[in-house]
Amino acid sequence: MIKTYDSNEYDVIVVGAGHAGCEAALASAHMGQKTLLVTIGLDMVAFMPCNPSVGGPAKGTVVREIDALGGQMGKNIDATYIQMRMLNTGKGPAVRALRAQADKWQYHEHMKDTIENTPNLTLRQAIVDQLVVEDGVCKGVITNTGAKYHAKSVVLTTGTAARGKIIIGELTYSSGPNNTTPSIKLSENLEKLGFKLRRFKTGTPPRVNGNTIDYSKTEEEPGDKTPRHFSYESKDVDYLKNQISCWMTYTNNGTHEIIRENLNRAPMFSGIIKGVGPRYCPSIEDKVVRFADKDRHQIFLEPEGRTTKEVYVGDFSTSMPEEIQLKMVHSVAGLEHAEMMRPGYAIEYDVVEPWQLKHTLETKNIKHLFTAGQMNGTSGYEEAAGQGLIAGINAALSAQDKPGFTLGRNDAYIGVLIDDLVTKGTNEPYRLLTSRAEYRLILRHDNADLRLTEYGHELGLISDERYEKFEEKKQAIRDAKERLHEITVHLSDDVQEFLKSIGQEPMKAGVKADVFLRRPNVKIADIERLTGEKIPGDRYVKEQVEIGIKYAGYIKKEETRIARLKRQEAKKIPADIDYEMIEGLATEARQKFEKIRPETLAQAERISGVNPADLAILSVYIQNGRYSKVKKYEAEDLKPSSYFAEKYGLEADAETGASQY
């Protein structure tokens, strides 16, 4: 038994320094709270044990949202990327996504340096084995060396280290990601505290030596020449010119045959793996089985940095035995002679069932305890970082006895992510997709600052200087819109010829420039050229104006739906409501309400298995005063009449049966 001793006191303690933990700790420190960030290994701060990239569909928007709120991930990747690309440029603005290839070592070093130089923030290497909980309130942590750190709030971001187990074929051993020390006792402690945990699984592909790849047999995927950034504070002049390409190749029938012949040795199919894996990031053996009609699968060869020869074999995740992995790799065009530097592996780990959380990411059964990241059942660095930021903000607010901060589904993809977790839970590693957002035309990559910077400034995460620039941008957008409304695009041969060149019908009369801009494929630059007028604002301002005008009708429809959502969100459900008292609820709805404890009628509406009739009954019960009547009887120890008891399921007065309300 290790003897404990009282160490330092903090306002907030963050356990785990992955992408969630870094954002949580930085947010807390920037909000003026004395913060301790504890990690199993200092060499794993903001480490990328899987794909060396940031962004992509939905995920890239999350990174922009983190930056708009005052988080660090966007700045960190802008300082350490080796390639930047905008995806889905041929599609509408709702699904465009920025993706950066990271130098994973520089990313880690830059984030660690940021943390080490942030006031109010202490970084320490230790393994947390136990929480200090008194009267249902978390008051600190105890490490494996016996140090007891006291705090007003605690954030857990254990990632895949929580009782982690690595699996490579028949080989299994206790480990965190990338062969790091796992966290065992903390999971056991959480179970003793009453938390429901479950096992998830994720995996990573082999890494090969870039010097042994025959790139002539692959297709080059270069970065964008047009400057792109995740952070709104990054400048075009700093955009990286000397980018490193990724490369694309494919599996083939030979690859698939090797996999099929060895499925009996695949842990996924042999029964060794018990945890549930990610549906949207399956292993290559899973893809070969599930999509047997496909004769090839895409593979991306992604450099892991400027100073390493390691290349990540993307979309080739596997837990096959090492000897089989070698055969699989060598069957792929361009990789016939590739040297494998690290084998792929699967890792099983513990997650907290996320329905045990509030939207602030505070746990429901222990106050001042927050969880974030893969620990909550998500997959991906970006989802983790977004949760970490919200958990860190709320831990800091909780430490000051201030009300919590939440984002709605209409505010941000981060809000969609957290609401899905808290309201629906998840039976598999959760990945954020654009299709999960009902209001994705409003939750765009380009307007995250317009949606969230106000919040970041109010929370103290956005400086006054940055906020002033944000206000200037908003004014520039207004000025550009006004100028477009003032300018007239007159009938002319140049205008008609231009319309013909883009496949548009000719004009019959002159129109205002903002009306002309509504036509497909018309840009503000075209209006400036055709009219000789200058529209104020930089390219980011003009992008906002173009999207706002072109999609005005669709945006208005989404805003109407959001207004209805807000009305439902305003209808709060009392925290101590007893669903057994509500007559007429379906059994499934009653059980779901009791398990999830929705905070508003809007959240109740989103719970799977709940039908409109159940919602109507719940709404009437709350709004017609029946809830308050029930609470009155409880408070005054009154017994209702037998009629009232029969109708609303209360205990009647046995002596008189008289009405007492």
Swiss-Prot record:
Keyword terms: Cytoplasm, FAD, Flavoprotein, NAD, tRNA processing
Any one annotated GO CC term: cytosol
InterPro entries: FAD/NAD-bd_sf, GIDA_C_N, MnmG, MnmG-rel, MnmG-rel_CS, MnmG_C, MnmG_C_subdom, MnmG_C_subdom_sf
KW Chloroplast (keyword) present: no
Stretch list, region Disordered: 206-230
Record: residues binding FAD: G16, A17, G18, H19, A20, G21, V128, S183, Q374
SUPFAM superfamilies associated with the record: FAD/NAD(P)-binding domain (SSF51905)
GO BP terms, alphabetized: tRNA methylation; tRNA wobble uridine modification
Domain of life: Bacteria
UniProt-annotated location(s): Cytoplasm
A molecular function GO annotation: flavin adenine dinucleotide binding
Compositional bias per record (Basic and acidic residues), positions renumbered to this chain: 216-230
Chain residues that bind NAD(+): 277-291
Signal peptide annotation: none
Transmembrane segments: none
Cross-referenced PROSITE patterns: GIDA_1, GIDA_2
Family (UniProt): Belongs to the MnmG family.
Role according to the record: NAD-binding protein involved in the addition of a carboxymethylaminomethyl (cmnm) group at the wobble position (U34) of certain tRNAs, forming tRNA-cmnm(5)s(2)U34.
Subunit structure: Homodimer. Heterotetramer of two MnmE and two MnmG subunits.
Protein name per its UniProtKB record: tRNA uridine 5-carboxymethylaminomethyl modification enzyme MnmG
Encoding gene, per UniProt annotation: mnmG
